[in-house]
Design a protein with these regions (language model features):
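Catalytic phosphate/metal-binding cores of nucleic-acid and nucleotide-processing enzymes, i.e., regions
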Residues: 2-149
Length: 149
């Protein structure tokens, strides 16, 4: 019961934030801002729903804007940060896959060429790669993946 209420609240918060964003955000920043909100919503749901696995879900801060405007961008690239890396990597194997890679996209967002390369590399390595556009899709993806442990 509690987890259902939490799920509903998270989805409602995500939807309200997306409506506010569409009404207030400058046009060119909409997709990135929506993806940030989606990522935060997904991460909070995951941490509440699966606290035992929270250390196995990771995000590398390699967002395009961060890399373009961050003074340390060159240093981060030299240290191994790469364009196109999935938004989340879940390092828990199930019966079918050794890990799960999740790319978050806004409703109209599309993969970059670098992200398509990562998708191919993940799938070639035997991992599962999923593109998620809503918090609800993220929940279904994680729950389905964990059913096969």
């Amino acid at each position: 019961m509690f987890s259902s209420i939490v799920r509903i609240l998270i989805i409602m918060t995500d939807i309200l934030d997306q409506f506010r964003t569409l009404a207030n955000a400058p046009t060119r920043r909409r997709p990135a801002y929506l993806e940030d909100k989606l990522q935060i919503s997904c991460k909070y749901w995951f941490d509440m729903q699966y606290p035992q696995y929270r250390l196995l879900l990771h995000h590398s801060p390699n967002e395009g804007l961060l890399m373009k405007h961050d003074r340390d961008g060159a240093k981060r690239k030299a240290m191994g940060m790469r364009a196109g890396f999935p938004d989340f990597i879940f390092l828990l194997p199930n019966k079918k896959y050794p890990y799960l890679a999740i790319e978050l996209k806004s409703a109209k967002g599309r993969q970059s060429d670098h992200q398509k390369e990562y998708q191919q590399a993940v799938e070639t390595a035997g991992g599962r790669y999923v593109i998620v556009r809503t918090t609800e899709e993220f929940m279904v993806t994680i729950n389905d993946y964990l059913k096969k442990i």
